[in-house]
Amino acid sequence: MSQAEFPITPEVEADLRIARRGCDELLVESEFARKLARSRATGVPLRIKLGLDPTAPDIHLGHTVVLNKMRQLQDLGHTVIFLIGDFTSTIGDPSGRNSTRPPLTREQIEHNAKTYYAQASLVLDPARTEIRYNSEWCDPLGARGMIQLASRYTVARMMEREDFTRRFKTGVPIAVHEFLYPLMQGYDSVALKADLELGGTDQKFNLLVGRELQKEYGQEPQCILTMPLLVGTDGVDKMSKSKGNYIGISESPDSMFGKLMSISDTLMWRYFELLSFRSLEDIAALKAEIDAGRNPRDAKVALAQEIITRFHSAKDAEQALANFEARFRDGAIPDDIPEVNLAGAPMGILHVLRASSLCASSSEAQRAIEQGGVKIDGAKIEDRSLQLNAGSYVLQVGKRKFARVNLAV
């Protein structure tokens, strides 16, 4: 029976909905549906690949978006391949860069890979995850094999990539070795005989190279699934340590809880879609309750507890909630406090205190901070240069002055 003849059953359609949830693109969807149908009919799991270059040892919630998708597909019974690009890391991925990315040393790669996988295992099921290193097949290629591989793809096709085109037009140098990165990543799919490859939206070109190379090597081409980049806690830029708008998965439960409670109500629903394992039906029902008048805080608490349970424990999640509520209770925050809407995030704390009428001047705000009299969401602050990203905050000055500040861009 050919792949096209396997029936698209209701179970296959349900699997396809899970794959599509929150994704940016699924190419080619009709092909992937047939792959799912074949897998259902034959009992042979699909080989689903996620390649990661361990360029940094720690990961945040933004990195887990694609890991969550891998876990969802893993739970459908498919084989998940967690590919560590120890070879390609020595080249340096130019994706989205305006300059050459420096390669890593073998020692850096080994350290980062161990730390990265240990954290990724909090999302993936280690018992059902195949770990591979692309040096297994890339190192033996040698010069002859590398040249033969390069002959499979043209410079014209390579220049279709936006960042290469931009750098070429603006006179920013492109090193020849940078062309090798997407080729080597594509060759990984050939070596692994991948049925589906996942990646961020910035990896689309590289994933398509893998699809084309599989055709060159006589294999059934993989489908590709790209996931969006998670917006950070500021509600503006993608989650990034450099932007200060990130939530690290190794942060303390209290820190994670506070940051998740600070995001805007609108952003909360995007986090539910990309970070929660709740069904879309459950999320829709919760949203309907909020729209009908239930406090959005209840939904944020549910989201925060789910995420903290995943990366710590249910007990830690309950304790983080208790600690969060205790900070407010001990601070004797009134039920009805003035609400202030401000625009211009990120905004300095001195400006926020002045604009919300909690302090008459910047000097008064500075003194209040130095004397330990300023709290944000129940936590005392000491940094007078603190910048607040977009979000909702409860500010307290002294024992009796409060304001709920909704800070927008």
Swiss-Prot record:
Compartments, as annotated in UniProt: Cytoplasm
Binding-site residues, ATP: K241
A Gene Ontology BP annotation from the UniProt entry: tyrosyl-tRNA aminoacylation
Enzyme class: ligase
GO CC term, one of those recorded: cytosol
Record motif 'KMSKS' region, residues: 238-242
Single Gene Ontology MF annotation: RNA binding
Main location: cytoplasm
Catalysed conversion reaction: tRNA(Tyr) + L-tyrosine + ATP = L-tyrosyl-tRNA(Tyr) + AMP + diphosphate + H(+)
SUPFAM superfamilies membership: Alpha-L RNA-binding motif (SSF55174), Nucleotidylyl transferase (SSF52374)
Domain S4 RNA-binding as annotated: residue spans: 347-407
UniProt cross-references to InterPro entries, sorted A to Z: aa-tRNA-synth_I_CS (IPR001412), aa-tRNA-synth_Ic (IPR002305), Rossmann-like_a/b/a_fold (IPR014729), S4_RNA-bd (IPR002942), S4_RNA-bd_sf (IPR036986), SYY-like_C (IPR054608), Tyr-tRNA-ligase (IPR002307), Tyr-tRNA-ligase_bac-type (IPR024088)
A Pfam family it matches: tRNA-synt_1b
Enzyme Commission number, as recorded: 6.1.1.1
Keywords associated with the record: Aminoacyl-tRNA synthetase, ATP-binding, Cytoplasm, Ligase, Nucleotide-binding, Protein biosynthesis, RNA-binding
Family annotation (Gene3D superfamilies): HUPs, RNA-binding S4 domain, Tyrosyl-Transfer RNA Synthetase
Residue window of motif 'HIGH' region: 54-63
Quaternary structure and interacting proteins, as annotated: Homodimer.
Protein family membership: Belongs to the class-I aminoacyl-tRNA synthetase family. TyrS type 2 subfamily.
Function, in words: Catalyzes the attachment of tyrosine to tRNA(Tyr) in a two-step reaction: tyrosine is first activated by ATP to form Tyr-AMP and then transferred to the acceptor end of tRNA(Tyr).
Name of the protein in question: Tyrosine--tRNA ligase
Taxonomic classification: Bacteria, Pseudomonadati, Pseudomonadota, Betaproteobacteria, Burkholderiales
